[in-house]
Amino acid sequence: MAAVLGLCGGLGKRKFTRFPTAFVCLTNSGTRAVLWRSCSQCKQVTSSEDLPIPMENPYKEPLKKCILCEKRVDYKNVQLLSQFISPFTGCIYGRHITGLCGKKQREITKAIKRAQILGFMPVTYKDPAYLKDPKVCNIRYRE
């Protein structure tokens, strides 16, 4: 239903029989009055009541944080480092998969290479003892 705007000189009861249920009357002081057909009283609405309430965007997604920014990466922590290696090929996952920041991704890569050179980690596959570890990255493998 479209509302019809009726301009009134003052606030008075007017009978509108063939129009929609609400009319807006402008008074001399600048306030708006809403006239309802069903009720004989006029409700005055100030212009500040109709303004939207400022609030945060409810659809905004929270910012992604690097999960290792507060942690220290060590080449001897093989269980942590094995989470960032593919169990089938032994390749190191990239930033788009791990979700790490650039600084921590470089540290992880250097620590993995150092652990592989020093013999703490295998080069080609993930150690079977760590296959059932909780997943750090949200990666799904084909079964």
Curated annotation (Swiss-Prot):
A Gene Ontology biological process annotation?
A: translation
Give a yes or no for keyword Transit peptide in this entry.
yes
Query: What is the annotated localization of this protein?
Result: Mitochondrion
List the cysteine pairs that form cystine. Answer: none
Pfam families according to UniProt: Ribosomal_S18 (PF01084)
Q: Which domain of life is it from?
A: Eukaryota
Keywords tagged on the record: Mitochondrion, Ribonucleoprotein, Ribosomal protein, Transit peptide
- GO molecular-function terms, A-Z: small ribosomal subunit rRNA binding; structural constituent of ribosome
The record's section on InterPro entries has: Ribosomal_bS18, Ribosomal_bS18_CS, Ribosomal_bS18_sf
Q: How does it assemble?
A: Component of the mitochondrial ribosome small subunit (28S) which comprises a 12S rRNA and about 30 distinct proteins.
The family line of this record is: Belongs to the bacterial ribosomal protein bS18 family.
Q: What name appears for this protein in its UniProt entry?
A: Small ribosomal subunit protein bS18m
